[in-house]
Amino acid sequence: DLTQFGNMINKMGQSVFDYIYYGCYCGWGGKGKPIDATDRCCFVHDCCYGKMGTYDTKWTSYNYEIQNGGIDCDEDPQKKELCECDRVAAICFANNRNTYNSNYFGHSSSKCTGTEQC
């Protein structure tokens, strides 16, 4: 669920609050082309959730563990898929922290142009 995703981000050394309104894809919804590697993490995360169809991605909880700086997801197949979407995004944020640009926090969606396919 979203709380667990936020906790994953925090445990990987980032603040979840940095990503709530960042770029064109971090936060609710998204449009246009991702503006940098950090925003692309959110784009890929949105695409991953989108592939799950009608599954309740935002409120379904799952089990995971942080071990040796990595994230291990639950074995339940559908919950594991959801956890993997969140795991990949949390690691992506950590790996791309150097691309984070505070000018893109609160970025207006009207500036998000073009198209990008999942």
UniProtKB/Swiss-Prot annotation:
Domain of life of the source: Eukaryota
Coiled-coil spans in chain: none
Class of enzymatic activity (EC top level): hydrolase
Cofactors (names): Ca(2+)
Taxonomic lineage of the native organism: Eukaryota, Metazoa, Chordata, Craniata, Vertebrata
Cofactor note: Binds 1 Ca(2+) ion.
Similarity-based family: Belongs to the phospholipase A2 family. Group II subfamily. D49 sub-subfamily.
Single GO MF annotation: calcium-dependent phospholipase A2 activity
Protein name: Acidic phospholipase A2
